[in-house]
Amino acid sequence: KVKVFKTQIILKELEKKMIGKICGTGSYLPDYIIDNFKLAESVDTSDEWIQERTGIRQRHIAKKETTSYMASMAALKALENAGTEPEEIDMILVATSSSETVYPCTACEVQKMTGAANAVGYDVNAACSGFVIAFHTAQAYIHSGICRTVLVIGAERMSRMVDWSDRGTCILFGDGAAATLIKKSQKLFFSYLDSDGNEEVLFSKRNDYLKMKGQDVFKFAIKAIPL
């Protein structure tokens, strides 16, 4: 009941102010591909097993591309798709968990590579939900009037973080980037975010590679968001 009431208040407030709409999109995928049959040569799995559980047939792998390069290529395509010049961008938000450096952030690299001289940029690190949270953040900046045009990018180079002998993770992840250009609009937009840091599924021992409790995550997800 509290969440419903909170939602009603937010909707009423949104009706009074500007909000953002997607005006352009772009993406980038590396050329090198590893399909399920190739994976089955090194781990105990099969194309049928992977597709049945994930729907994934293949994943793109960055051999030379960096996270910032893939993000920039996707961003330039989004700008072209929207018919917008880089100088018009007020903010760049990059959702990533696999940046090459801690500092500078990937968003600053994208600013340089795209020529978005007037934009401020920073990264959002929220794993699988990163792009959604970055998109929601962009809406907040537009809603407040601080920004008029925001570039939101999701970019990952997960292949360098995955243990390719771990069937629980190597079948799921690949590399690539996607970008959306968001501009102010009077159309209504609403989203709701929630976090739960109490679940045991969130915790694992520190490791050199990405680790994930897939079954536990799945069970938590369908409990939190009923199908």
Segments the model singles out, each with a brief description of its role:
Residues 23, 95, 125, 150-156, ...:
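Short beta-strand segments
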